[in-house]
Amino acid sequence: MTQLNTPVARVSDPGHRPTPPPSVPRRRRPIRGTRRAFWLFVGPFFTGLLIFSIIALFWGFYLSFTRAVATISPTEFVWFDNYVSLLTDPSFLSSLLSFTVFAILVVPTTLLVSLVLAMLVANLPVARAFFRSVFFLPTAFSYVIASLIWKLGIFSGSPSSVANTVLSSVGLPPIDAWLTQSPYYWVVIVTVRLWLQVGFYMLLFIAGLQRIPDTLYEAAAIDGLSRGPRRFFAITWPQLRPTTAAVLLLLLVAAFQAFDEFYNLVRTIPSARPPLLYIYNLSFQQLDYGKGSAGAFVVTAVVVLVALLQSRFFGFGAADEAKKPRRGARKERAS
């Protein structure tokens, strides 16, 4: 008899499943037109940025070293004469003093009020989203509209205005010079700026409060540190240091950019003009574009200097640096 060489099928375990062969990942082909679509969306933005920001920045820097009166085409290269004339102009120095007073009044007030509101809203048992929306809503208002409301309705100087009605209700005489005399116009300017921007910085502090681990408060409660000022200064305030530094920097930059409320409320008072209003009058009323460009770069240099000093003394990322182990500690752990 002859044996047929037929393959014998292997009997496999019924519970065993054969392993499928490894699948080779397929390369995804790039979608056609992706690069073209990218430039179609981003191209107009970069074109506007190049024309209205970058080229304008370099052209303004060039104008600051030239004499350009009633024309943007320079007629004479004067080197640093515009800067010297600007820094020796009493009106410009008075505008820097106005900014200093405004910053001293509005920056700490906004910081304190926004921090207090953030802690109150963050600790509410209910309706947190509602109160966040209520306090944030004024940031959507225009500075021009808010200034007109303050000027025509709240601090108009008439006996029927809101401010004078409140003063009369508590037995105080009404004030007619809200918008013409110091320190009354500072009350008007600071309150309108406070109403417009405190909600935004409140949200920043709420975000900082939400980043604080609950374990820190639990450990403090175990150690006997109850709610109150001691726990705030021991735990909350150090953890909010990076957020506070960012808020301070944003407030200082916003104070330097103050223009709308001053222009609509006290533009006729020379002693209440901030640097931007002085540069506006210099460039668009006196038509001295060379000196106006020099003023813009002087203000920019002051903003950068103040920001560097603020970050140097208060510090960004101080909490992150504190969390990093020192080199000596690393060596001890390694040994």
Q: What are the residue ranges of the model-derived segments?
A:
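Short, intrinsically disordered terminal tails adjacent to the first/last structured region
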Residues: M1-P25, P325-S335
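Low-complexity, intrinsically disordered short peptide segments enriched in small/polar/basic residues
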Residues: N5-V8, P21, R28, W39, ...
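Gly/Trp-centered helix-boundary motif
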Residues: Q3, R29-P30, W59
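Cytosolic juxtamembrane amphipathic/interface segments immediately preceding
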Residues: R26-P30, T34
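A structural signal for multi-pass alpha-helical bundles of membrane permease subunits
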Residues: T34-R327, E332-S335
